[in-house]
Amino acid sequence: MKQYFVTGTDTEVGKTYVTCQLLRAANNASLTAIGYKPIAAGCELVNGEWVNEDALNIQQASACANGQTLPINEINPIALTPPIAPHIAANEEGVALTHEKIAEGLNALAAYRPDILLMEGAGGWRLPLTIGSDNTPTHYLSDVVKALKMDVILVVGMRLGCLNHALLTAEAIRADGLIIKGWVANDITGNMTRYQENLRSLKAMLPEPLLAEIPYQTGIEAGTLLSAIEQLS
């Protein structure tokens, strides 16, 4: 079983979309693949359960060997109501964002023994989990990923500023002693000026492999994601 952490250069860069595309591609390649979003904010009460749209998409894209649909509270064990920064939402709701809770959920999904397990973060790499009395963060989600020694998939949202965001995020991941397995260029606007020039710059500046280039709201060629899955499996 291979486990990866999916992070992004910012919030709203398509982490969930990329995660779901990779899960489906793996399942279509006769592999079992499960997604995990330990923390999600902006949840709504549906049939007695707190549900986040991203977590629901991951649930639908995941597949176990026995074909069962995993419970949403296993895909997303920490569901927060306000659509705000998770550590602020957790503080307001009296919820503890702990390493133990996140690792426990990961281990529960690993027990299904999928070929690939993707854990998706929230926001960017340095997402605060807990803060001290002076509002200074004391723990970050990246600390959990570091402790779990997970390789990282970096989703780059292709928009103005992505070069700086990608380089800084990659530097932070490497500084934490983790391996970037590869990165995904996700076209999130469809109208980025000098898109190809920016993509070429990223290829030149990031030593890690480009796993896939995902176009804006159009079909993805099967071979594109199959190549990514071959590198991940």
UniProtKB/Swiss-Prot annotation:
Q: Name one GO biological process term.
A: biotin biosynthetic process
Superkingdom of origin organism: Bacteria
State if Metal-binding is listed as a keyword: yes
Where is it localised?
Cytoplasm
Q: Name one GO cellular component term.
A: cytosol
The broad enzyme category this protein falls into is ligase
Tell me the residue numbers annotated for binding Mg(2+). T16, D54, E120
Transmembrane segments annotated in the record for this chain:
none
Q: In which pathway does it act?
A: Cofactor biosynthesis; biotin biosynthesis; biotin from 7,8-diaminononanoate: step 1/2
Annotated ATP binding lies at E12, V13, G14, K15, T16, Y17, D54, E120, G121, A122, G123, N186, D187
Which transformation does this protein catalyse, written as a reaction? (7R,8S)-7,8-diammoniononanoate + CO2 + ATP = (4R,5S)-dethiobiotin + ADP + phosphate + 3 H(+)
* InterPro entries assigned to the protein according to its UniProt record, in alphabetical order: DTB_synth_BioD, P-loop_NTPase
Q: What is its EC number?
A: 6.3.3.3
Q: Which UniProt keywords apply?
A: ATP-binding, Biotin biosynthesis, Cytoplasm, Ligase, Magnesium, Metal-binding, Nucleotide-binding
An example molecular function term from Gene Ontology annotations: ATP binding
NCBIfam families with a match to the protein in the record? bioD
Q: What protein am I looking at?
A: ATP-dependent dethiobiotin synthetase BioD
User: Source species, please?
Assistant: Alteromonas mediterranea (strain DSM 17117 / CIP 110805 / LMG 28347 / Deep ecotype)
